[in-house]
Amino acid sequence: MNQQIFREYDIRGMADRDLTEDVVINIGKAFGTIIGANKTVAVGCDIRLSSPRIKKTIIEGIASTGVNVMDIGVVPTPLVYFAVHRYNTDGGIMITGSHNPIGYNGFKMLKGKKTIYGEAIQSLKEIIINKKYNVGTGGIKISDVISGYMDTVLKSLSIEKTMKVVIDPGNGTAGPIVTSLLSNIGVDFICLNCKPDGHFPAHLPDPTVPEYMNELIEKVKSSKADIGIGFDGDSDRIGVIDEKGNMVYGDRLLGVFAKDVLKNMPGSTITVSYTHLRAHETPEHL
């Protein structure tokens, strides 16, 4: 087992080389052991070519420790967090390579409502090395959480003016859900590379890389759209293009989001990292 896959905030490696069936089933057993018997966890995956295999195997490992599994299928990463909170599960795992190159995959994990990171990830590794697993028989249930997520999001949305939007899911998980949401709220939109495809035929889904945003930029300008939004492969990261075709980076987006929060919830505290490029400037402009 390549111990370098156990990183600070997730487990990640080359799917065929590092995330073999033996490694994955043992990660599942270790995760199930820290969750505890007779508990329930939600498990979802992205559309990478290796994800179905990895999901099937890790579910097998988790269930072998007496933990019940809610299999929520192919979903964006935020839906695993939604499932954990909505259905009050005891944890969750998202199988995803995120914005990394095609051959990668990995795991984002929660115990209870909290993300597993740092020493907790290293503890998983030690359980695997020592092979100290709980033993039991957990149930596996296939569950649809997308409809509940859609209802929740739609109830929280309020569109103040009509906009024309171009989106580029990059053939990742965002396409079906985002297009459905935009249709339901009556937004005029164009979708590029909407169909989920783990080969990522258009470009790697990483909206922080300017060259991967070129198609979106050109479409925003040619269609005279108000905004363009690009997503990464598991839909927990976005890149934004303004109406002139310029990239709007995360430091500026923070100010936009903070301003909206303060408008609706005056007096709220906005916490930022001071490694953030505009952390000093943002409060002065809100």
Question: Where are the language model's segments positioned?
Answer:
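N-terminal small/polar loop signature for handling phosphorylated ligands or for N-terminal nucleophile
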Residues: 41-104, 187-241
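A short, N-terminal amphipathic alpha-helix
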Residues: 29-37, 218-219, 259-263
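Gly/Ser/Thr-rich active-site loops/lids in small-molecule metabolic enzymes
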Residues: 193, 246-265
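Conserved small/polar residues in nucleotide/adenosyl-binding loops
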Residues: 275-282
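Conserved PLP-anchoring active-site segment centered on the Schiff-base-forming lysine
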Residues: 41-43, 80, 167, 266-271
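Gly/Ser/Thr-enriched, mixed-charge loops and adjacent short helices
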Residues: 105-223
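Short beta-strand-to-turn element immediately C-terminal to the catalytic PLP-Schiff-base lysine
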Residues: 109-112, 239-243
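An N-terminal, well-structured beta->alpha segment
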Residues: 1-58, 64-65, 143-163
